[in-house]
Amino acid sequence: MEYKAPSTAAITAEIEAQVIADGWMKACGGDTAYQIIKDRLQVYLRRPDDANFEQIYHCAHELSYPFPLTEGAMNEFRPLLTALIEPLDPRALRALCGKITDVIYSRFSAACDDNPLSLTPLAAFIEKVRRTHVTRIYTTNYDDFILQAAPDLYTGFANVPAAGPQQFELREFWERRDDGSVFYLHGSVHLGFPHPMPEGSEIGDLHWFHARDEARKHARFDGSDVSRMDGAQIMRTSVVTGLDKLSRLQQRPMSHYYAALAADLMQADIIYVIGSGLTDLHLNSWLREARSLSPAVPLLFIDYWNGHFLEATAFDAQRKEILLFHELRVYAKGPFGGVRVGDHWTLSPDGTSAIWDNGFQHFLAAQDELDEILSRMKSVA
């Protein structure tokens, strides 16, 4: 967000404005479906501002599959939720899902060119880590700021400025475990579905486009969906959104990214978790496993609180703080306490984790303080 990629609230407002103004949305009923879902969520969640685009997309996607079935349909192709709900028009919901992903893709792609901040501090930090460790970055962001800062990082695709789409390197991905890399767990503004399909590719394969403008032309997939175990399906998308992301990570290359994430976390010398609200439970599960090892993998949590972490969370533990404690095993508050180091670091009593509370840009500018906290942590290789 510091690099001006849109916040959840901003992208939600942008999606709503474009859905309401879009002629095709009006013609197919997508605007009405959006408003119905939003209105019901606002009542259900009790606070109007709590309904965001991921929740709306999730509802639209899940409700879009209760289509009429023929009498002889096999049970595995009968979406189970159909028996329990009275559906909205599935065509309108499907169109709405497509529109939401289009807006996300275009807005984040545009943000990559509008960053007002220098990427030099980010580049310096990545280079610093790479001098001492094999650096494997897993991001849930769609933008390419990391690649702008470190263009030579491996993505699972050939690192050359090719004019056309590039296929995922299925074998090379697993052979290049020691290369500095960045992997886009939830998709990227460089991914798309090329048409016509390149020779040797399969239906629904995501490809990498060096030019974002070219990738944007191929952002949407208009072919078949992917079947799920409950009889419903998953729409193929170049950026993964909604609340149920894990089932969407079964497409290539995300399935390989997620498998490698598990191995890397369990074998890591140190883990940096930067700017995460800890809302992706499929990622928390592997962070928890790495932190459950004996000794635990050292972890640095970089985020922002309004004030020093220990003071800001002394009497008010929100979902993030609860997950930080129970899932990531960062015992730096409550009965365990925490050791204040400098102005913005908190070191857990067991010495295996630390929290920075003053935002990412200030973290990048305070590398001497990072060196100090690393020297005080246990088991940092």
Regions found by a protein language model. Give the residues of each.
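Short glycine-/acidic-enriched loop or helix-start segments at secondary-structure transitions
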Residues: L147-A149, P194-H195, H282-N284, E311
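Short, well-ordered alpha-helix to beta-strand connector turns
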Residues: T132-V134, D179, A268
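Short alpha-helical segments and helix-capping/turn motifs at coil-helix boundaries
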Residues: P121-R130, Q166-R171, N284-W286
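Gly/serine-rich nucleotide phosphate-binding loop at the start of the catalytic core
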Residues: M1-Q148, D152-F157
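Short, flexible loop/turn elements at secondary-structure junctions
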Residues: Y142-D144, H186-V189, L278, D303-N306
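Hydrophobic/aromatic beta-strand patches that form the interior of the parallel beta-sheet core
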Residues: R136-Y138, S181-L185, Y272, L300
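SIR2/sirtuin-family catalytic core signature
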Residues: M1-A17, M25-T32, I37-K38, R47, ...
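Active-site gating loop/helix substructures
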Residues: P87-P116, Q148-A259
